[in-house]
Design a protein with these regions (language model features):
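Short, flexible turn/loop "capping" segments at secondary-structure junctions
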Residues: 6-7, 118-120
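Short acidic-aromatic low-complexity motifs
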Residues: 130-137
Length: 160
């Protein structure tokens, strides 16, 4: 994804740390696109896809006490993209993948601080809305989930 890796003058590659302004831009775009994907998924998600999302959520919940943040992050990624793929909008999913790649180095900073304050309530609300095929509620809860996480990262960037 564009901007995910930068070339240094000495030909080394580095992953750039995003500024607060860059994170705000990323937040606004991700909230819009991930909200759209979730809204669309609510009307199309199959029982098998929903079961997969619920299984991924159970893995996240089971990992919380262990403090294995890398594993949690992998399951969170699986859960989100299972939802986004249910939108049946592959071009949109590819856009979201690129945005996640751009944010990945900062996303590790969500652990453990932010994730200990967030007990998965927005994720649970999203899953419940998907189960009801309630597109508006699913979109709102996903937008809040993504927005809150990025707001936390913006706060960290502003404090530096």
């Amino acid at each position: 994804a564009e901007g995910a890796i930068e070339a240094e003058p000495n030909k080394w590659m580095r992953v750039p740390r995003l500024s607060a302004d860059e994170l705000r831009e990323l937040r606004d775009i991700r909230v819009a696109l991930e909200g759209l994907a979730t809204e669309r998924a609510a009307g199309l998600i199959t029982p098998a896809e929903l079961a997969e999302v619920k299984r991924f959520d159970a893995e996240i919940v089971a990992l919380r006490p262990s403090g294995d943040w890398k594993a949690m992050m992998a399951w969170i990624n699986r859960l989100h993209f299972a939802i986004y793929r249910a939108s049946r909008m592959p071009a949109l999913v590819r856009m979201i993948e690129g945005l996640w790649l751009r944010a990945a180095p900062q996303a590790t900073r969500l652990f453990p601080g932010y994730t200990q304050t967030q007990r998965g309530t927005l994720r649970t609300a999203t899953i419940r809305a998907l189960a009801r095929h309630d597109a508006a509620s699913a979109r709102r809860s996903m937008e809040a989930d993504v927005g809150n996480a990025l707001d936390y990262l913006i706060g960290l960037a502003e404090a530096e």
